[in-house]
């Protein structure tokens, strides 16, 4: 079987690290959300997930959050072994690869700091270079990576730019992965300085990405658009979406809703992959821009190439690909790879942010409550005016 040979390099530039994979074909990664629930669905999904990881020659995994449906109590919580290490291990080591993840709504209900601490101590600085340590006892399951509540990961891969390598040579494509915490970005997040820094860092990340990356993928828990039970987030649609559109983001990968879906809007695909261990049906009305929706337990496999991005939705109920979505590569006028190192220098430092323990999260963002309240007030005024008009006519 022919497969891609990869070489893993990491360089440390001034205040941040950049990880580079040199891949002599397409770049493949998988996405899996809301996976940490002790169910038959998780076991079945993990079975097919490991098969596809091996057969598709996936390079790394991204998780949009809600890793542990009931959260974790700490670093010694049995959930780490029972719901992660044992479930996603593979004897031959095929599953040992980076597992990039962020916190989701349900993770914040437990000891969220433990999940951050689990991802520390991975990056070792030696003479200005950063490397990922390979633990002797961690070769059979994915390597947990979460250096901060939000962070970025830049990579590149090489493809043939034409049918004849001799005539046309190779073409280098860059991909930027930006991981966000949608709760930290929420207006309801109690620590405003951290909230503001997360937004400022995101703007800087997107500003750099659109200058050096052919592909931009943003990963976060809550969907912006959804036909699932959340119906998406009006707050993210108002504040986050314009930033993503301005940067010409290709994919926004989310979880939160326990289903699989793709909604395409202005050349950006909104991918929901939140059925890693359980599933729920769609809400009463399907989003008008939804191209595909499934309540099956499953996951996604993504392939980046010279032509664009192909996303395969895999159903573990059926054990096969049930939908394939294709997004053409964009010709971004903002690209300036000649000055890539200069742009890299503008990236924010990736370091662990100290977030104190806090109380339960609010059920709704302040934005939603305020807009809803205004709507009720307007409605009340209309009803009052209508009633007054009716009484006035009948009193004459």
Curated annotation (Swiss-Prot):
Residues where a metal cation 1 binds: 195
Catalytic reaction(s) noted: a phosphate monoester + H2O = an alcohol + phosphate
Domain of life of the organism encoding this protein: Eukaryota
One of the record's GO cellular component terms: inner membrane pellicle complex
Cofactors: a metal cation
PTM remark: The N-terminus signal is likely to be cleaved.
Activity regulation text: Activity is independent of metal ions.
Membrane-spanning intervals of the chain: 370-390
Cofactor note: Binds 2 metal cations. The role of the metal cation is unclear.
Domain comment in the entry: The C-terminal transmembrane and cytoplasmic domains are required for the trafficking of the protein to the inner membrane complex.
Function, as annotated: Component of the glideosome complex, an inner membrane complex structure involved in parasite gliding motility and host cell invasion. During the asexual blood stage, may play a role in the assembly and anchoring of the glideosome complex to the inner membrane complex. During the sexual stage in the vector mosquito midgut, protects gametocytes against host alternative complement pathway-mediated elimination by interacting with host complement inhibitor factor H.
Record-given protein name: Glideosome-associated protein 50
């Amino acid at each position: 079987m022919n497969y891609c040979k990869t070489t893993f390099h990491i360089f440390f530039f001034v205040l941040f690290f950049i990880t580079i994979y040199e891949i002599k074909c397409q770049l493949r990664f998988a996405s899996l959300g809301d996976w940490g629930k002790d169910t038959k669905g998780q076991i079945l999904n993990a079975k097919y997930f490991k098969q596809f990881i091996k057969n598709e020659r996936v390079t790394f995994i991204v998780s949009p959050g809600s890793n542990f449906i009931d959260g974790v109590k700490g670093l010694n919580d049995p959930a780490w072994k029972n719901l992660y290490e044992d479930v996603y291990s593979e004897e031959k080591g095929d599953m040992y690869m980076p597992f990039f993840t962020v916190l989701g709504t349900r993770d914040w209900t437990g000891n969220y700091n433990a999940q951050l601490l689990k991802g520390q101590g991975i990056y070792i600085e030696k003479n200005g270079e950063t490397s990922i340590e390979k633990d002797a006892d961690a070769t059979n399951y994915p390597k947990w990576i979460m250096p901060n509540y939000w962070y970025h990961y830049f990579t590149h891969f090489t493809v043939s730019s034409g049918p004849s390598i001799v005539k046309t040579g190779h073409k280098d494509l860059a991909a930027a992965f930006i991981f966000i915490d949608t709760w930290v970005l929420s207006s309801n997040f109690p620590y405003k300085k951290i909230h503001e820094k997360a937004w400022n860092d995101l703007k800087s990340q997107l500003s750099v990405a659109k200058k050096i990356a052919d592909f931009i993928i943003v990963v976060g828990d809550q969907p912006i658009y959804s036909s699932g039970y959340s119906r998406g987030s009006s707050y993210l649609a108002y504040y986050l979406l314009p930033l993503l559109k301005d940067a010409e983001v290709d994919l926004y990968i989310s979880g939160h809703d326990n289903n699989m879906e793709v909604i395409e809007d202005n050349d950006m695909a909104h991918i929901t992959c939140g059925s890693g261990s359980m599933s729920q049906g769609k809400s009463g009305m399907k989003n008008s821009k939804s191209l595909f929706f499934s309540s099956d337990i499953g996951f996604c496999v993504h392939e980046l190439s010279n032509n664009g991005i192909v996303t395969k939705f895999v159903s573990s109920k059926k054990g096969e690909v049930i939908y394939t979505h294709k997004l053409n590569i964009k010709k971004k006028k903002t690209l300036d790879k000649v000055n890539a190192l200069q742009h890299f220098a503008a990236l924010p430092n990736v370091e662990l942010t100290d977030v104190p323990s806090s109380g339960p999260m609010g059920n709704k963002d302040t934005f939603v409550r305020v807009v809803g309240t205004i709507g009720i007030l307007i409605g009340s005024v209309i009803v009052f005016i209508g009633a007054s008009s009716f009484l006035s006519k009948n009193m004459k």
